[in-house]
UniProtKB/Swiss-Prot annotation:
GO biological process terms held by the UniProt record: symbiont-mediated suppression of host innate immune response
Short sequence motif Nuclear localization signal: positions: 56-71
PTM comment, free text: Phosphorylated.
Keyword Phosphoprotein: yes
Species of origin: Bean golden yellow mosaic virus (isolate Puerto Rico-Japan) (BGYMV)
GO CC, any one term: viral capsid
InterPro entries: Gemini_AL2 (IPR000942)
Name the UniProt record assigns to this protein: Transcriptional activator protein
Subunit structure, interactors included: Monomer. Homodimer. Homooligomer. Self-interaction correlates with nuclear localization and efficient activation of transcription. Monomers suppress local silencing by interacting with and inactivating host adenosine kinase 2 (ADK2) in the cytoplasm. Interacts with and inhibits host SNF1 kinase. Binds to ssDNA.
Family that this chain belongs to: Belongs to the geminiviridae transcriptional activator protein family.
One family name in Pfam for this protein: Gemini_AL2
Localization (cell): Host nucleus; Host cytoplasm
Record bears the keyword Cell membrane: no
Length: 172
């Protein structure tokens, strides 16, 4: 009768494994990693004594990793999610400067309480009203075309104005 070797559970931390003989079990239906040796299949067990962390520990870690963001709804219909540590910084979107102060933020709640796609008729606009900051228009103006030469190239004299003796000296 063939035999199979496996590690004794109480010696899993030892660098020298003790093997015991057990009856052969077909491993075609199990998903264990096996290797064939001359004495038969050998089950490869993990040498690590540690257990995977419990689900409660994983949930506790996940709760602390949440990224806190706030949401700004703009007049153009765009929504911008702003990191909470970036408060009191402004930004420009589609040629309009926006202030990111605390009044202009709303927390994104999600689900049925989500402010997404809701009509907010009242409230302050998030457009910056400071007159010192230039507010360029949506369309960029193009420079006027001129018929003269560009400024970087000086005017060249007409070839007709050059004396014929000049040409005679060049083509001798």
């Amino acid at each position: 009768m063939e035999s199979r070797f496996k590690l004794k559970e109480e010696y899993h931390q030892s660098c020298c494994a003790i093997q015991v003989r057990v009856p052969v079990i077909k491993t075609s239906s199990t998903k264990r990693k096996t290797e064939l040796y001359t004495t038969g299949p050998f089950i490869m067990r993990s040498s690590s004594p540690s257990q995977p962390p419990s689900i409660k520990a994983q949930h506790r870690i996940a709760k602390h990793k949440a990224i806190r963001r706030r949401r700004i709804d703009l007049n153009c219909g765009c929504s911008i999610f702003y990191h909470i540590k970036c408060a009191d910084h402004g930004f420009t979107h589609r040629g309009e400067h926006h202030c990111a102060s605390g009044r202009e933020f709303r927390f994104y709640l999600g689900g049925t309480k989500s402010p997404l796609f809701q009509d907010h008729a009242g409230g302050r606009s998030s457009i910056h009203t400071d007159k010192d900051i230039p507010h360029p228009s949506q369309v960029q103006s193009q420079p006027q075309e001129s018929t003269g030469s560009p400024q970087s190239i000086p005017e060249l004299p007409s070839l007709d104005d050059i004396d014929s003796s000049f040409w005679d000296d060049i083509f001798k």
